[in-house]
């Protein structure tokens, strides 16, 4: 923040220096933000951005110019505009102008309508957000205003569960001391509630009349994208007060468990930190589009070459032969030489031969993409019945790109997980609870479990809580002391707040979902946390109210990884209760607990193996004298001016030792349904999945194991946590060394010390033996993304099977995606559900938003949306793969049929004096791509499939051809062109050879221009129809109708154009009456057509037959397998759920926030509001994933890792 030097210590508004009246910040770099409360006139001088957001690209005025500019970025559109201009020049126009202008206008119009429709829905979504209502204090009265009309300096009233409309300075709230609780999942992905507090001088401004008189001015930092930092000063009543991030409510947050609060708007609209992290809407193009632009340029070069050849031929012919015809065929007056005749002939042939890339290609592409989008929208298997939400293709231009994805970047919270924590299992005094066994002693699966435990004995039980093991409740009821102490610890050692609005209706306000789950479990098992004061905690233990004196809270932080409370019970006994990470607490236990420790560690291994989040519970008795002495030293440490945190940590370490082990808890962070199966399937499809989350490392790693991204079968999991550039570089170097040493050990024959180029190093790393994973923290990632280290990070990460980035900001998410796009040249997909994911969604080639959540920002920015992560496998492996396959087959066929059609003119030029005479009449040229051959190829492009959808999911390796660009690339393009040229040669020379000596039935000469044209045109239509029949892999009634219908339409139009009726109406246009009927009545003509068709098609049939038998690809094998299966009985395969076992690792994860204990002890948050507890659902099985993993590892050439694979830090 910049504060003018001349500002006095006692600030007064009248003394504001002239420099304050700055011009609009957007004219230059804004150095500081100034906002005065309740003074719109003053704030308007700075012309700050309004609170209106915009994700749309056009408006009414800009739509036409901007959209046309975008469309003419397509090389083909510019090419056709150029041809149209040429056709308007009479001297060189060999075809009517309407043959180009009609299709060009048609394709521009269709694309414009599609873009306008897409943008209309963006406008509609923007309006839904901008028109949300907010209560704004205007002229001393609270008025309902739309979000878009909120201005900087306005005072807004927020109520519970409302989204924050702009970046606000919290002034006051319904909670004591100006506290309020917010959920920031839309910003940083964390679901645990956070606390914000108004500064004391404004916390009492809860009355409208007081707020109306508030005229303080805030001077603070300019708009930026730093979510966790804010610095500013409030000047009011001749005093100044420092402001920090703890005083701010950011747009995208939700007010929770707070009845109301008031805030002063500091940043609005695009200046908010949320929008600063969102990035710009980019015009996305597919790799096929980019390739098409290149190919169109090549074709244009080929076209110029043909034009030059024919122009030179024209000049030579005119000079050598044409001079003889001058007597009765004189040149036009403007043509005075053979050279100039050749020059005009060049442009005429450019017009004639332009059909090698017809404009109808682009119309057809848009129609096909639209059809694919509708298939996605109509897919019932991607419809979520629970949320009544269908899948939606929000753009129609990226469908085939879905079949080429190599990297998926996924958010965690709300995307992979449900944000629901469930108390799943526990270990108490060496006994594990939570599993249910049948009469034979086998562990019961989820669907085989009996009714959940009945908690009806407890009137205060949470009815949503489910637990399946009745033996734990029996242990509580019989008064087992260890079990009672276990739940007593859970009911005392926490920072949860409680409220009871009605008798028996108890609500918990949990600062983290983990704590909410643990305290709720204790509540249902008879240890009900009822209330607290700054110095006491009241618990109902099996119906008896007991009040404990709260002596101290040893608060949680990410370094300690534990929290403790010290309480005195009614008998005067002092006891410390502690819960924390097993890696931390197990070293602080008394040696007498060793036997119990070994058993508990076995249980912890089991829980961690199931992907559960674990905590260890312990206690310690303290004598009065020791506690008093310790409390005095703690007080002195808390008052220290320097190294306060270090001194307190040392004091805490001292007391948290030699504790007695009670047991462990296992909480399930519930995954979205089908997440493990989806990740397994996508991994088998050679898609790498990176998780980018704002959550902490332990939580992210635990979810990695839960969803099977990380497994104990991995050779090693590298964890990068360096705080400096050197530390991060060293950790990345060691990771690469280990991977390369592993490859060397299996005979790759190189060492890390070998000097390798960057490209060679990358290829070596990607071929490493074994499976590795990389976990990197946000502060380390900031260094890894620096220009001089980003390649090292990328090489290391891409050599790993899984990558998890923790504590990352929205901007870092986008930077990671951009890094992969920049260097890997791979198709990327980003998927998320919150506003913190918008930036990476916009940056990736394809953005997917999870809909049905509270926030809609991710959906608004996305290209595709659906309600559950599991639908991603169907979007990619079915719709994406089919879209890519269909588009590739369509393009190959389209180029083939148009080269076969156009190149006939080239060969004809050598027999017509290079006069730019066409073989076909202009009506056939116009209708060939629009009527005669358009619908069959459209049907193939929309409906074709190589294997059914079930096989696409069953054989994910079918997805790999799209990733490798195997189905349409430069090689395939040249093959299609060669086939088209081959067909054109036969199409011209076989009829030419036959017609040279053929006669009609009456003995007259068969050869005339019109008969030859009809024969060639008919042969062409039949040959390309047979060819598309060969190319079609999935026949529908529509395919049959379009192919046979197109042939029928061709003959109908052909006979009509040569009929007496049209001649009578248009004698100058349709002069060749009866020519088609007479020509096609000749057996010689039909024999010629059949011969041409056979000679054109048989080599294709022979080649495909040989390839199918000698070198079939996977889709051929799958189709063959499918035929075999139809002849055999389908065998039912029973899949047994297999739990993950392996080496020891910590299952600890606890999403708690530091500083809450101090807040409780201060008594500032003792007045409570309600909390709606999360609903608990049963856990879904992910049994079959292990089989998929095993299947892949069996097929891999690298040997499996050893038994002990440590989690590397």
From Swiss-Prot:
Gene3D superfamilies for the chain: Calcium-transporting ATPase, cytoplasmic domain N, Calcium-transporting ATPase, cytoplasmic transduction domain A, HAD superfamily/HAD-like
UniProt-annotated stretches for the region Disordered: 1-36, 1181-1209
GO terms of biological process kind: Golgi organization; monoatomic ion transmembrane transport; phospholipid translocation
Biased composition (Low complexity): 1195-1209
Effect of residue 204 to Q: Impairs ATPase flippase activity
Binding residue positions for Mg(2+): 411, 413, 833, 837
Spans within the Cytoplasmic topological domain: 1-64, 113-295, 369-889, 943-972, 1032-1037, 1104-1209
Composition skew (Basic and acidic residues), residue ranges: 1-12
Keyword entries, A-Z: ATP-binding, Cell membrane, Endoplasmic reticulum, Lipid transport, Magnesium, Membrane, Metal-binding, Nucleotide-binding, Phosphoprotein, Translocase, Transmembrane, Transmembrane helix, Transport
MF-aspect GO terms: ATP binding; ATP hydrolysis activity; ATPase-coupled intramembrane lipid transporter activity; magnesium ion binding; phosphatidylcholine flippase activity; phosphatidylcholine floppase activity
Annotated binding of ATP, by residue: 411-413, 515, 556, 579, 613, 693-695, 807, 813, 836-837
Pfam families: Cation_ATPase (PF13246), PhoLip_ATPase_C (PF16212), PhoLip_ATPase_N (PF16209)
CDD domains to which the protein is assigned, alphabetical: P-type_ATPase_APLT_Dnf-like
UniProt cofactor(s): Mg(2+)
Active site location: 411
Exoplasmic loop side: 87-92, 318-346, 911-922, 995-1008, 1059-1078
Protein's job: Catalytic component of P4-ATPase flippase complex, which catalyzes the hydrolysis of ATP coupled to the transport of phosphatidylcholine (PC) from the outer to the inner leaflet of the plasma membrane. May contribute to the maintenance of membrane lipid asymmetry.
The protein, known as: Phospholipid-transporting ATPase ID
Originating species: Homo sapiens (Human)
Gene name as annotated: ATP8B2
């Amino acid at each position: 923040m910049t504060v003018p030097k001349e500002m006095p210590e006692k600030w007064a508004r009248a003394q504001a220096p002239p420099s304050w009246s700055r011009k609009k910040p957007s004219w230059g770099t804004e150095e500081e933000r100034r906002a005065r409360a309740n003074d719109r006139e003053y704030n308007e001088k700075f012309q700050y951005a309004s609170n209106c957001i915009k994700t749309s690209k056009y408006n009414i005025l800009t739509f036409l110019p901007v959209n046309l500019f975008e469309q003419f970025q397509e090389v083909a559109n510019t090419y056709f505009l150029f041809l149209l201009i040429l056709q308007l020049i009479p001297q060189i126009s060999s075809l009517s102008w309407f043959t180009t202008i009609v299709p060009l206008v048609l394709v521009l119009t269709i694309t414009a309508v599609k873009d306008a429709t897409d943008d209309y829905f963006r406008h509609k979504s923007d309006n839904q957000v901008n028109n949300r209502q907010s209560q704004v204090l205007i002229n001393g009265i609270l008025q309902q205003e739309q979000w878009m009309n909120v201005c900087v300096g306005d005072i807004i009233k927020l109520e519970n569960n409302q989204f924050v409309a702009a970046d606000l300075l919290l002034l006051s709230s319904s909670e004591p001391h100006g506290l309020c609780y917010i959920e920031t999942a839309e910003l940083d992905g964390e679901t645990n509630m956070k606390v914000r507090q108004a500064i004391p001088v404004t916390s009492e401004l809860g009355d409208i009349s007081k707020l109306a008189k508030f005229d303080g001015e805030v001077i603070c930092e300019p708009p930026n994208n730093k979510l966790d930092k804010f610095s500013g000063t409030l000047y009011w009543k001749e005093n100044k007060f420092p402001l920090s991030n703890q005083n701010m409510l950011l747009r995208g947050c939700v007010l929770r468990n707070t009845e109301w609060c008031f805030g002063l708007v500091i940043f609005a609209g695009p200046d908010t930190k949320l929008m600063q992290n969102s990035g710009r809407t980019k015009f996305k193009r597919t790799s096929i589009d980019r390739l098409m632009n290149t190919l169109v340029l090549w074709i244009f070069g080929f076209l110029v070459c043909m034009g030059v050849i024919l122009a030179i031929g024209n000049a030579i012919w005119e000079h050598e032969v044409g001079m003889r015809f001058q007597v009765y065929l004189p040149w036009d007056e403007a043509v005075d030489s053979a050279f100039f005749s050749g020059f005009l002939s060049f442009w005429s042939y450019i017009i004639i031969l332009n059909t090698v890339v017809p404009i109808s290609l682009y119309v057809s592409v848009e129609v096909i993409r639209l059809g694919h989008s509708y298939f996605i929208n109509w897919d019932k298997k991607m419809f979520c019945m629970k949320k009544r939400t269908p899948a939606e293709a929000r753009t129609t231009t990226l469908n085939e790109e879905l079949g080429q994805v190599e990297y998926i970047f996924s958010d965690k919270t709300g995307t992979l997980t449900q944000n629901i924590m469930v108390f799943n299992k526990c270990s108490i005094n060496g006994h594990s609870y939570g599993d249910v066994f049948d009469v034979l002693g086998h562990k019961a699966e989820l669907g085989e479990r009996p009714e959940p435990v009945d908690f009806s004995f407890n009137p205060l039980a949470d009815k949503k809580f489910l637990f399946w093991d009745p033996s734990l409740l029996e242990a509580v009821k019989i008064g087992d002391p260890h079990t009672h102490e276990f739940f007593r610890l859970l009911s005392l050692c926490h920072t949860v707040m409680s409220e009871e609005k009605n008798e028996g209706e108890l609500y918990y306000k949990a600062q983290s979902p983990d704590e909410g789950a643990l305290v709720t479990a204790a509540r249902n098992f008879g240890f009900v946390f009822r209330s607290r004061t700054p110095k006491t905690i009241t618990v109902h233990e099996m119906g008896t109210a007991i009040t404990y004196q709260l002596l101290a809270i040893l608060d949680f932080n990410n370094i300690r990884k534990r929290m403790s409370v010290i309480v005195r019970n009614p008998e005067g006994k002092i006891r410390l209760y502690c819960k924390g990470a097993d890696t931390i607490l197990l070293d602080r236990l008394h040696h007498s607990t060793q036997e119990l420790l070994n058993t508990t560690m076995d249980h912890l291994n089991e829980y961690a193996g199931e992907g559960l989040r674990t905590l260890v519970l312990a206690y310690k008795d303290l004598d009065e004298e020791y506690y008093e002495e310790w409390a005095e030293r703690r007080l002195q440490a808390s008052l220290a001016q320097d190294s306060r945190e270090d001194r307190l940590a040392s004091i805490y370490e001292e007391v948290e030792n030699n504790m007695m082990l009670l047991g462990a808890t296992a909480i399930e962070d519930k995954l979205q349904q089908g997440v493990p199966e989806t990740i397994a399937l996508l991994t088998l499809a050679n898609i790498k999945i990176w998780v980018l989350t704002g959550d902490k490392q332990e939580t992210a790693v635990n979810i990695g194991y839960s969803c099977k991204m990380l497994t104990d079968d991995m050779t090693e999991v590298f964890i990068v946590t360096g705080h400096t550039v050197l530390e991060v570089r060293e950790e990345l170097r060691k990771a690469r060394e280990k991977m390369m040493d592993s490859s060397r050990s299996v005979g790759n024959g190189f060492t890390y010390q070998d000097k390798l180029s960057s490209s060679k190093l990358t290829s070596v790393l990607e071929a490493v033996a074994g499976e590795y994973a990389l976990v990197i923290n946000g502060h380390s990632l900031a260094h890894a993304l620096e220009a001089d280290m980003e390649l090292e990070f990328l090489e290391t990460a891409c050599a790993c099977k899984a990558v998890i980035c923790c504590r990352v900001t929205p901007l870092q998410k986008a930077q990671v995606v951009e890094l992969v796009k920049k260097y890997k040249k791979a198709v990327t997909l980003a998927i998320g559900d919150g506003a913190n994911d918008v930036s990476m969604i916009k940056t990736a080639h394809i953005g997917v938003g999870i809909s049905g959540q509270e926030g809609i920002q991710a959906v608004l920015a996305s290209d595709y949306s659906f309600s559950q992560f599991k639908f991603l496998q169907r979007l990619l492996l079915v719709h994406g793969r089919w879209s890519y396959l269909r588009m590739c087959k369509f393009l190959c066929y389209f180029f083939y049929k148009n080269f076969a059609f156009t190149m006939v003119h080239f060969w004809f030029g050598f027999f017509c004096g290079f006069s730019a005479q066409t073989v076909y009449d202009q009506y056939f040229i116009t209708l060939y791509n629009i009527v005669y051959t358009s619908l069959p190829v459209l049907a193939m492009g929309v409906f074709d499939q190589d294997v059914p959808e079930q096989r696409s999911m069953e054989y994910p390796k079918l997805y790999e051809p799209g990733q490798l660009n195997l189905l349409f690339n430069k090689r395939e393009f040249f093959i299609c062109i060669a086939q088209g040229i081959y067909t054109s040669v036969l199409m011209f020379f076989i009829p030419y050879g036959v017609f040279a000596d053929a006669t009609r039935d009456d003995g007259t000469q068969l050869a005339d221009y019109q008969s030859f044209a009809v024969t060639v045109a008919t042969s062409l239509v039949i040959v390309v129809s047979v060819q598309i029949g060969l190319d079609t892999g999935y026949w529908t009634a529509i395919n049959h109708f379009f192919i046979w219908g197109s042939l029928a339409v061709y003959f109908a139009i052909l006979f009509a154009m040569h009929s007496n009726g049209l001649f009578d109406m248009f004698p100058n246009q349709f002069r060749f009456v009866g020519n088609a009927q007479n020509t096609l009545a000749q057996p010689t003509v039909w024999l010629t057509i059949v011969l041409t068709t056979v000679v054109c098609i048989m080599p294709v049939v022979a080649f495909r037959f040989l390839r199918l038998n000698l070198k079939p690809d996977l889709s051929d094998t799958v189709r063959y397998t499918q035929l075999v299966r139809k002849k055999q009985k389908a065998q039912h395969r029973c899949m047994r759920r297999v739990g993950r076992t392996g080496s020891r690792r910590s299952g600890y994860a606890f999403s708690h926030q530091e500083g809450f204990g101090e807040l409780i002890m201060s008594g500032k948050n003792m007045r409570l509001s309600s909390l709606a507890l999360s609903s608990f659902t049963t856990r879904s099985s992910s049994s079959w994933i292990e089989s998929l993993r095993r299947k892949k590892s069996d097929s891999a050439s690298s040997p499996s890792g050893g038994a002990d694979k440590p989690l590397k830090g």
